[in-house]
């Protein structure tokens, strides 16, 4: 220091920077779309620490431990394979002014916080209504819904309601191990790895996709435009989901907002 001079340090230098803790349950093509849209909308002035907890509550809890106070916002995609009640209780105890949930609305979490979500039951009903003219060329609709998964059971409720309303034969499969592929059937798949297996088995059975067998895949990704001249998809607008979550963070918004569902009809149906 220089004798006779007094230095003043602005309080602004000690203000906590705006930091976000971002927790995804897993990595996938559509999660990348959410991430890219979210971070692009936030811009370079916001710091984001990104973690993946692999649908595992123990890992989720470990990541959160001692970190809450360091962040301005905690943004979570809340899907778990196990210990759902413990996970929801932990989330419910987070400061609500910091909490932003993405992709899923959870009734067990109360208070004034922010959610950007999919309305699973209404979305599947809306999508199948949009595709009803194409579906009328088939008599049976089967959904591949893995028995051990984080997918919302409300998807099943909406699917079954639609099939019953329009008198389609329907079935819920946990996997494709013992499946007999017959003409007149439409398959709805949720998991990306099941889509590869499904297409391979249909082709091996020498059935034509788009006429004898229909395929509908959850979650639009760029590659689905190209597979078999185009796979029909039903999907949340993931870019909008990421952008909306970022806007809610930047504006310190509260409330629950459902993201529109989109149907992209292609040659597989």
Predicted ranges, named:
Residues 25-29, 51-58, 115-129, 143-181, ...:
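Hinge/beta->alpha junction and helix N-cap segments in small-molecule ligand-binding domains
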Residues 7-66, 70-71:
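Amphipathic helical "hinge" segments at domain boundaries
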Residues 21, 71-80, 142-146, 183-191, ...:
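Periplasmic-binding protein-like
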Residues 181-183, 193-269:
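Flexible loop/turn connectors
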Residues 82-83, 105-142, 195, 235-254:
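Hydrophobic alpha-helical segments within soluble ligand-binding/sensing domains
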Residues 78-122, 219-229:
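Flexible loop/hinge segments that line or gate small-molecule binding clefts
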Residues 1-2:
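N-terminal helix-turn-helix
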Residues 59-73, 89, 175-182:
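Short, well-structured alpha-helical segments in soluble
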């Amino acid at each position: 220091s220089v004798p006779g001079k007094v230095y003043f340090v602005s309080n602004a230098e000690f203000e906590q920077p705006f930091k976000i803790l971002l927790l995804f349950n897993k990595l996938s093509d559509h999660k990348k779309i959410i991430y890219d849209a979210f971070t692009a909308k936030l811009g370079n002035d916001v710091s984001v620490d990104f973690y993946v907890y692999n649908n595992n509550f123990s890992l989720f809890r470990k990541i959160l431990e001692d970190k809450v106070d360091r962040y301005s916002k905690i943004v979570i995609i809340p899907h778990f394979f196990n210990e759902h009640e413990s996970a929801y209780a932990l989330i419910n105890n987070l400061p609500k002014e910091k909490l932003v949930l993405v992709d899923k609305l959870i009734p067990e979490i109360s208070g004034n916080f922010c959610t950007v979500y999919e309305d699973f039951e209404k979305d599947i009903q809306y999508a199948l209504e949009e595709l009803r003219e194409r579906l009328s060329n088939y008599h049976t609709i089967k959904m591949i819904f893995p028995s051990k998964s984080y997918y919302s059971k409300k998807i099943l409720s909406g699917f079954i309601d639609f099939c019953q309303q329009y008198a389609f034969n329907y079935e819920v499969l946990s996997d494709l191990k013992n499946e007999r592929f017959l003409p007149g059937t439409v398959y709805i798949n949720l998991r990306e790895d099941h889509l590869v297996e499904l297409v391979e088995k249909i082709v091996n059975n020498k059935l034509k996709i788009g006429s004898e067998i229909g395929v509908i895949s959850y979650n639009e990704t760029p590659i689905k435009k190209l597979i078999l001249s185009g796979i029909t998809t039903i999907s949340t607008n993931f870019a909008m989901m990421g952008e909306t979550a970022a806007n809610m963070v930047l504006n310190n918004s509260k409330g629950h907002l459902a993201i529109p569902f989109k149907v992209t009809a292609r040659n597989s149906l």
